[in-house]
């Protein structure tokens, strides 16, 4: 089932002249929560230049569900399978 409501990233992009975010490049326990606490608009998870795998990204996306943050995932290539996995896991945007 597809949720038609706008995500946090879309809301921030449509309501602010500029948005700010930070990037996580490896497994961490504090990343997304600290970005939310600092007032960032989004958090990105970098699987292209970082040390994150599908499972790590899925865990971190799950941790952001209750946070007022948009989520972006940067993948190393445009293969459909990983794009689908991170989209299914809840990413607001895939780069």
Question: PLM features: what roles do these ranges have?
Answer:
Residues 1-95:
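Expand to "…catalyze enediolate/carbanion chemistry for C-C bond making/breaking, isomerization
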